[in-house]
């Protein structure tokens, strides 16, 4: 009987040890599926090429939002299927064709493995389906989708050779160039592949502020993120946010903030409510906020504020680009995000807390911040 308390203490100690081990095991498993899943990529290196290729495709789909995570890619694919299976199919075709073209052109294998040779064609495939005037399941569209997807690695390689002189990424410039080229060549009145008609605003929009819906504004936040892929379903946008969250909570936070700032910018310019609800004011600013807020600049309070400024600037610049592009009957796409973010990345400052990441070291926000802090520590310890 005297030994009973001792036995209880031992049992409690064992339970605490098992609980700690369980938590550590849980964190370890979570570490394998979050971030850029580097361990999984290393594990795949000696596996069949088919498995590696599937990983590259899924990473390409997720790289549109700066995420290199195959599970995030699966979630984004699910979101696309919720929105429209035909759009999802065209996006997958574009990603596959672009990745294969990059392999044939002997592009950098590490970039291909990270999905960097697929994401532009993902957008090309989806947006060609979105802007097609033939509706869903117009199977002949697969041919121009494949053809334009082949141009993406060419555009990427050419732009990279120029922008690499300043250590800058190509972003979605290849997508903008490929889609603009296709829509310019076909247009609304093409017999085979007619597209939607884009026209400049020709009258003052009828806006009644009392009709502004708080619920619709709330829904426009995930819709703004969804419009990065051309999707207007709030559930799809929510799935995309979950996909980003899995890889990087900081990137997810900035994606949501960027979409919110786009809504604020739209309201400040008295934009038609339908455009705001449709997410057209949120997607460019969302991308810009992610890019500056921890992706290509190490996250500090200074760069966080800079990301907010860049998001607002991008939203206003997006309105400018929409008006200009409509004159030549083209959509604004993500031109404003690319140009505005490149402008902010070229910013020079003597503030050590505004640190632009070397392009070769960019991974995801949390890892980028660790690199920045380690580099800062080394500079303090050995200033020479």
Curated annotation (Swiss-Prot):
Induction: Down-regulated by water deprivation in urinary bladder and ureter, but not in kidney medulla, colon, testis nor brain. Disruption phenotype: Mutant mice exhibit grossly normal appearance, activity and behavior. Plasma sodium, potassium, chloride, bicarbonate and creatinine concentrations, as well as hematocrit, are similar to wild type animals. Urea permeability in erythrocytes is 45-fold lower than that from wild-type mice. Daily urine output is 1.5-fold greater and urine osmolarity is lower than in wild-type mice. After 24 hours of water deprivation, plasma urea concentration is 30% higher and urine urea concentration 35% lower in mutant mice than in wild-type animals. The record marks 334 as: Important for channel permeability. It catalyses: urea(in) = urea(out). Keywords: Cell membrane, Glycoprotein, Membrane, Phosphoprotein, Transmembrane, Transmembrane helix, Transport. Glycans are attached at residue 206. It is a multi-pass membrane protein. It is found in: Cell membrane; Basolateral cell membrane. Expressed in brain, kidney, heart, liver, lung, skeletal muscle, spleen, testis, ureter and urinary bladder (at protein level). Along the gastrointestinal tract, detected in colon, jejunum and stomach (at protein level). In the kidney, expressed in some microvessels of the inner and outer medulla, but not all (at protein level). Not detected in the cortex (at protein level). Detected in the urothelium all along the urinary tract, including the papilla surface, the ureter, the bladder and the urethra (at protein level). It comes from the Eukaryota. GO terms for molecular function: urea channel activity; urea transmembrane transporter activity; water transmembrane transporter activity. N-glycosylated in red blood cells, as well as in most non-erythroid tissues, except in the gastrocnemius muscle and in the gastrointestinal tract, including liver, colon and stomach. The chain crosses the membrane at residues 61-81, 85-105, 111-131, 138-158, 168-188, 250-270, 276-296, 305-325, 327-347. InterPro entries: Ammonium/urea_transptr, Urea_transporter. GO terms for cellular component: basolateral plasma membrane; membrane; plasma membrane. Signal peptide: none annotated. GO terms for biological process: establishment of localization in cell; urea transmembrane transport; urea transport; water transport. Pfam families: UT (PF03253). Belongs to the urea transporter family. Homotrimer; each subunit contains a pore through which urea permeates. Identified in a complex with STOM. Mediates the transport of urea driven by a concentration gradient across the cell membranes of erythrocytes and the renal inner medullary collecting duct which is critical to the urinary concentrating mechanism. Facilitates water transport in erythrocytes. This is Urea transporter 1. It comes from Mus musculus. The gene is Slc14a1.
């Amino acid at each position: 009987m005297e030994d009973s308390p001792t036995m209880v203490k031992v049992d409690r100690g064992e339970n605490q040890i098992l609980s700690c081990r369980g938590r550590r095991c849980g964190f370890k498993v979570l570490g394998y599926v979050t971030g850029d899943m580097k361990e999984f990529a290393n594990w795949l290196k000696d596996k069949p090429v088919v498995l590696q290729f599937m990983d590259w495709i899924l990473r390409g789909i997720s790289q549109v939002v700066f995420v290199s995570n195959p599970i995030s890619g699966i979630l984004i694919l699910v979101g696309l299927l919720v929105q429209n299976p035909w759009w999802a199919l065209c996006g997958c075709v574009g990603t596959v064709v672009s990745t294969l073209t990059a392999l044939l052109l002997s592009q950098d294998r590490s970039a291909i493995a990270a999905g960097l040779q697929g994401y532009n064609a993902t957008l090309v495939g989806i947006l060609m389906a979105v802007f097609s005037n033939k509706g869903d399941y117009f199977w002949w569209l697969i041919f121009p989708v494949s053809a334009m997807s082949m141009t993406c690695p060419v555009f990427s390689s050419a732009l990279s050779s120029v922008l690499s002189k300043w250590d800058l990424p190509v972003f979605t410039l290849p997508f903008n160039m490929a889609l603009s080229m296709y829509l310019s060549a076909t247009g609304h009145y093409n017999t085979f592949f007619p597209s939607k008609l884009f026209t400049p605003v020709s009258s003052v929009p009828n806006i009644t502020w009392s009709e502004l819906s708080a619920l619709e504004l709330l829904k426009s936040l995930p819709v703004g993120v969804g419009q990065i892929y051309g999707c207007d379903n709030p559930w799809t946008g929510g799935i995309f946010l979950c996909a980003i969250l899995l890889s990087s909570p900081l990137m997810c936070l900035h994606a949501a903030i960027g979409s919110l700032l786009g809504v604020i910018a739209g309201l400040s310019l008295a934009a038609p409510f339908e455009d705001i609800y449709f997410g057209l004011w949120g997607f460019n600013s969302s991308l810009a906020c992610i890019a500056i807020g921890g992706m290509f600049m190490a996250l500090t309070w200074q760069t966080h504020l800079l990301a907010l400024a860049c998001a607002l600037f991008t939203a206003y610049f997006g309105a400018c680009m929409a008006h200009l592009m409509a004159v030549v009957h083209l959509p604004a796409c993500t031109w404003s995000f690319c140009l505005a973010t490149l402008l902010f990345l070229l910013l020079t400052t003597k503030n050590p807390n505004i640190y632009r990441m070397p392009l070769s070291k960019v991974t995801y926000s949390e890892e980028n911040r660790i690199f920045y802090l380690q580099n800062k520590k080394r500079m303090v310890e050995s200033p020479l």
